[in-house]
């Protein structure tokens, strides 16, 4: 493995725990500690912990910070509070998704954008390019933050025992600042990428290992990127670089809820997104279940039963929960019909599949 890969503060911790390390977005990350299935099931039915410190953090501060983030992002950031985060997209002028991200309003003039690891530099440069007309400062503060995700049905009860705040009633994307966890000050966000209840913990980078080790003392399973991928795919959650790209809009990529083109404020890509909201997008993302043995991989062609190509698979795996072969695919809008049978070209075979809902959690 290349020595040029970036490492999170937990890299040596992974090695000591015998994790299998892979390259992901320029980082050396654990794909698994025990087995993907074991880690997947721990999160789906009990509790697991992920290191996601490779994610990027970009800070926007200054007098025009609120207007600037609204101009950059496709969702309506105007109603953000200092206790409610928002999932949104950074779009280009054609409405294509440069990145999907979560934005936190830390103060009236201070916003934290949490972006995908592989896109951090690209996003940062894009944001810098568009700041000229605004009185703002933009900083890449990724090297100041550690980020952990504790996920699963038992996560809330454990966190409630360990922090100095009551998290019982916290709802999706609510967050609290200045929470104490193992003596460290953290931002605690009710969010995740697994389809399960849980929290994302933002801490000073120097506190990452203390919190990681502290949580693992409570019979929490360490989990790698392999389980993170199968969990998000079962839940129908898109991955940027596969299901979302710069040539896919929020309406095509299945994240229409992250686009609000009817608001008064202008934002980059608004005209294209407004047209797609009113008239429909040419393509749409669907869930697929293969009806024959095989795995649908990214880029595999999707066809109607006559063999006409109507789209392609964007992500696919075998579900550890159900054992079924599941996928997300992008198809022509007019070809969509729930339950419809299609074909997927898997190597030299055409396998039958059917359109199902994107969230395929089966437990």
UniProtKB/Swiss-Prot annotation:
Catalysed reaction(s) here are: N(6)-[(R)-S(8)-aminomethyldihydrolipoyl]-L-lysyl-[protein] + (6S)-5,6,7,8-tetrahydrofolate = N(6)-[(R)-dihydrolipoyl]-L-lysyl-[protein] + (6R)-5,10-methylene-5,6,7,8-tetrahydrofolate + NH4(+)
Question: What gene, per UniProt, encodes this protein?
Answer: gcvT
User: What assembly does the database describe for this protein?
Assistant: The glycine cleavage system is composed of four proteins: P, T, L and H.
Question: Per the record, GO CC terms?
Answer: cytosol; glycine cleavage complex
Q: Which InterPro entries does the UniProt entry name for this protein?
A: GCS_T (IPR006223), GCS_T_bac (IPR022903), GCST_C (IPR013977), GCV_T_N (IPR006222), GcvT/YgfZ/DmdA (IPR028896), GcvT/YgfZ_C (IPR029043), TrmE/GcvT_dom1 (IPR027266)
Q: Where are the transmembrane segments?
A: none
Q: Which organism is it from?
A: Staphylococcus aureus (strain NCTC 8325 / PS 47)
Lineage, top ranks: Bacteria, Bacillati, Bacillota, Bacilli, Bacillales
Molecular function in Gene Ontology: aminomethyltransferase activity; transaminase activity
Instruction: Describe the task this protein carries out.
Output: The glycine cleavage system catalyzes the degradation of glycine.
What protein does this entry describe?
Answer: Aminomethyltransferase
Q: List the Gene3D superfamilies.
A: Aminomethyltransferase beta-barrel domains, Aminomethyltransferase fragment, Probable tRNA modification gtpase trme, domain 1
Which family does the entry's similarity section mention?
Belongs to the GcvT family.
EC class name: transferase
Keywords attached to this Swiss-Prot or TrEMBL record, sorted alphabetically, are:
Aminotransferase, Transferase
